[in-house]
């Protein structure tokens, strides 16, 4: 019982350390240094959970190993649920059950992950910690792909405030930073006593001597990363060929929670803030409004005029834009008449960014990667009840766009990932490869009413700038409206939860990065190596059983 209580306490401590490392309600910018040891209790418990010896005689045979894997799964379930309940309390703002659903999903994922982590030290008793390191980074990569991709909680994002350290993301992506930060936890978890006791013995201290090469390599990699970050920072400062002046508008009111009269008032706020920004900086190159800042469908109501009140609002907006000499990038519901799966002509809605100059729509980007369940659910026929339940919660479903639009505004070329899209490296990479000189993120996190939620989102955007060596600006409904330099440094930020405009001037560096060239190759490489070592270990284990003539 004592062992169980100690292990449970360690798992709960690990979950708390994990959540505290990221921006959270107590520490809005997180405790990034804690991340370097936050997982140590977790890896320690995994080693202690049942047998770790491949000797069938010592482990109690196959039954002992299965029991160890089962116990590890239970600890994983506890860790997954607790860690993500603490990390994402703001999800309950979407729906009372959203946070619970996400935590239960992580419960299942972590239960499986812990089985593989336990298997690593069963198959490789001395060097299993290195395989655990590979497995965890692989897991972080895999959880970003597919319909359920959810990048919140990836270890490397805790370091967003350290430009010198995260410079290696221009080569390895976020995966290089995660690997660097994760290693001390894995190493310490292997060094701690893994039997019933909790005090160090001579055997545990010998671990540091035996595994000194791995520690030396990590220390060398850490030092090299800092040196590279410093060199790259100096290089980028001298490599910019020009600048862009941008006005970022923050209206501080969720546009989807307002009626028609409030929408009209909000239009007045947006136009007033824009006029003030242009008055302060007359030579501004671009004005940016946040995601769906203006709700009435601009193209639709200009074309079909089926709602007099909405058309009047759109006309008021276009009258304002007609006298502006500066192009505006506006977040809007872009509705089009298309043939749907039913074979009928119907209105289809896209979450979009419209580039408008003198009341003319110059170009449109339609959000490619939609938020699962909240914006998109492609399994209507497979799960009709769930689909209807989502609709009943007043969910706004969109059709995903396909084009990787690069906008042209005078001498500037830029792209505009919308909200959730700046959480994924491949999207900004695609834009950069298509010729974008800088990235503009339009976002709305006002629904959460949480500063820590907004800062968590910001922390991921920082890496998109570093990965592609491109400046990135964010126009957010309620915060964090800001400009991020190509090194990941925050150049300017508007105060959150205020109606304001932020005028920024950003550098426009040229060239590309290794990450822009090969993308998430290193995340894939971690996964491939982890799979190969696991398969090799299982093969050797089975061969050993055959040689000893024992049964599982």
Where are these regions (language model features)?
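Soluble catalytic regions of membrane-associated enzymes that act on cell-envelope
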Residues: 229-373, 407-410, 416, 420-422
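CN hydrolase (nitrilase-like) catalytic-core segments centered on the catalytic cysteine
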Residues: 133-134, 286, 294, 306-330, ...
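Non-cytosolic juxtamembrane linkers/loops
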Residues: 2-6, 219-280, 446-457, 462-467, ...
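Active-site catalytic loop in hydrolytic enzyme cores
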Residues: 89-99, 124, 144-172, 310, ...
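A generic fold-level signal
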Residues: 28, 241, 323, 346-348, ...
């Amino acid at each position: 019982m004592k062992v169980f209580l100690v292990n449970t306490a360690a798992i709960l401590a690990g979950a708390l350390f994990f959540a505290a490392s990221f921006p959270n309600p107590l520490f809005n910018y997180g405790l990034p240094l804690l991340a370097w040891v936050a997982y140590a209790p977790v890896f320690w418990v995994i080693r202690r959970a049942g047998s770790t010896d491949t000797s069938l005689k010592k482990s109690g045979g196959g039954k002992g190993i299965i029991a160890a894997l089962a116990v590890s799964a239970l600890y994983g379930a506890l860790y997954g649920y607790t860690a993500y309940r603490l990390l994402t309390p703001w999800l309950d703002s979407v729906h009372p059950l959203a946070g619970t659903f996400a935590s239960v999903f992580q419960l299942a994922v972590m239960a499986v992950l812990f089985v593989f982590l336990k298997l690593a030290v069963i198959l490789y008793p001395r060097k299993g910690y290195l395989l655990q390191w590979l497995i965890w980074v692989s897991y972080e990569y895999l959880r970003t792909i597919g319909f359920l991709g959810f990048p919140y909680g990836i270890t490397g994002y805790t370091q967003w405030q350290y430009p010198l350290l995260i410079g290696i993301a221009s080569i390895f992506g976020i995966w290089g930073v995660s690997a660097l930060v994760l290693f001390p936890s894995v190493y310490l978890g292997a060094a701690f006593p893994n039997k019933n006791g909790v005090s160090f013995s001579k055997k545990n201290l010998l671990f540091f001597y035996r595994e000194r090469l791995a520690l030396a390599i990590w220390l060398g990699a850490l030092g090299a990363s800092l040196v590279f970050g410093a060199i790259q920072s100096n290089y980028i400062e001298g490599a910019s060929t020009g600048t862009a002046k941008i006005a970022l508008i923050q209206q501080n009111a969720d546009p989807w929670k307002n009626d028609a009269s409030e929408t009209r008032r909000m239009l007045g706020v947006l136009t007033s803030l824009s006029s003030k920004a242009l008055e302060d900086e007359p030579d501004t190159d671009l004005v940016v409004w946040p995601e769906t800042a203006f709700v009435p469908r601009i193209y639709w109501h200009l074309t079909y005029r089926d709602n007099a009140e909405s058309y009047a609002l759109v006309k008021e907006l276009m009258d304002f834009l007609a006298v502006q000499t500066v192009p505006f990038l506006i977040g809007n519901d872009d509705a089009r008449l298309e043939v749907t799966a039913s074979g009928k002509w119907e209105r289809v809605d896209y979450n979009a960014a419209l580039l408008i100059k003198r009341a003319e729509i110059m170009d449109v980007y339609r959000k490619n990667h939609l938020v699962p369940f909240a914006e998109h659910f492609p399994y209507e026929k497979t799960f009709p009840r769930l689909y209807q339940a989502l609709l009943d919660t007043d969910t706004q479903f969109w059709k995903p766009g396909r084009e990787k639009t690069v906008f042209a505004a005078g001498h500037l070329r830029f792209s505009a990932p919308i909200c959730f899209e700046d959480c994924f490296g491949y999207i900004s990479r695609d834009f950069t490869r298509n010729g974008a000189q800088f990235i503009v993120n339009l976002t709305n996190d006002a629904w959460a009413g949480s500063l820590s939620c907004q800062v968590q989102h910001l922390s991921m955007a920082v890496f998109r700038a570093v990965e592609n060596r491109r400046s990135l600006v964010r126009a957010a409904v309620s915060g964090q409206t800001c400009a991020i330099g190509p090194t990941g440094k925050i150049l300017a930020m508007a105060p959150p939860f205020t109606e304001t405009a932020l005028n920024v001037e950003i550098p426009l560096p040229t060239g590309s990065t290794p990450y822009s060239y090969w993308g998430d190759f290193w995340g894939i490489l971690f996964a491939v190596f982890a799979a190969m070592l696991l398969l090799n270990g299982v093969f050797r284990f089975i061969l050993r059983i055959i040689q000893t003539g024992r049964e599982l």
